[in-house]
Amino acid sequence: MEKEFVFGHQNPDTDAIGTAIAFSYLQNKLGYNTEAVALGEPNDETAYALKKFGFEAPRVIKKAAPEVNAVMLVDHNEPQQSVSDIDKVKVTHVVDHHRIMNFNTADPLYYRAEPMGCTSTIVWKMFNENGIEIPEKLAGLMLSAIISDTLLLKSPTTTDDDKKAVEALAKIANVDYKEYGLAMLKAGTNISDKSEEELIDLDAKSFALNGHNVRVAQINVVDLPEALERKDAFLKAMEASSNDNGYDMFMLLITNILDSDSEALVVGSDETKELFEKAFDKKLNDSEVKLPGVVSRKKQVVPPLTEAFEG
């Protein structure tokens, strides 16, 4: 059977990489010939999880078409978040937990989208539905993905299925998920050794909102005031990135994983800043605003932005 690539979105997080590995394993068990690849290097948190459970990072690809004719997508569907030549390959499978936007195919496909906290939760359900056993180390990686996306089950995106998956996978992986989860999340919060340019690109996604190209980046920290000491440098990097890439607005969400509070930094035109303020019903103060309890880009940031920009 002809090989297909399985991959998550650009600037991959633990869900994008971990779930690509898990879904590739599942599909191979079901008779497909797949390879899990990535659209970027793993971040510190993901590297911690990969090392903990004995996985090599998937190789990074820039294009898919030179090697394969077909691909399977996990943790995304929007083409601007996918491989650069996504229009040159056939998408045969999508497993995702985000909104569906700007996604079209010429042929029928397998598409599974559920409002779960993490794509790995959906893949866990698929393992169970197909009666396929999850190996211990893979269970640990899938567990890591769910912990990452749900901030140790504290995010408002968390569902009962996410909680069930965490309990089940932790048992298979033989780990205390609370102890391991906090250690893994903390591994991803060291920002001192990275430049502002690196940080605003680590976990960033682009969204097309009513003709506007909106970039939303997020970084997790354990010390919010310390991170905000770099505010001016962050804003400068965001302005430069916007100019280079044609973003109409760039939002950086800085989230304290310990108390689930965030601050947002925003650059853009007067128009897009007004739309941002409309979305969150808050006024920006020197390009900054407090967003208590906002931790999820998917559930708490993109929906109000979409409503404001398209309203």
UniProtKB/Swiss-Prot annotation:
Catalysed reactions, semicolon-separated: diphosphate + H2O = 2 phosphate + H(+)
CC cofactor: Mn(2+)
Name of the encoding gene: ppaC
The organism of origin for this protein: Lactobacillus helveticus (strain DPC 4571)
Family of this protein: Belongs to the PPase class C family.
Cofactor note: Binds 2 manganese ions per subunit.
EC primary class: hydrolase
Binding of Mn(2+) 1, residues: H9, D13, D75
A GO MF label: inorganic diphosphate phosphatase activity
Keywords, alphabetical: Cytoplasm, Hydrolase, Manganese, Metal-binding
Record-level GO cellular component terms: cytoplasm
Name of the protein in its database record: Probable manganese-dependent inorganic pyrophosphatase
Compartments, as annotated in UniProt: Cytoplasm
Binding site for Mn(2+) 2: D15, D75, H97, D149
Enzyme Commission identifier(s): 3.6.1.1
Gene3D superfamilies documented for this protein: DHHA2 domain (3.10.310.20), inorganic pyrophosphatase (n-terminal core) (3.90.1640.10)
UniProt cross-references to Pfam families, sorted A to Z: DHH, DHHA2
Broad class of where this protein is predominantly found: cytoplasm
InterPro entries: DDH_dom, DHH_sf, DHHA2, DHHA2_dom_sf, Mn-dep_inorganic_PyrPase, Oligoribo/pAp-PDE_c-di-AMP_PDE
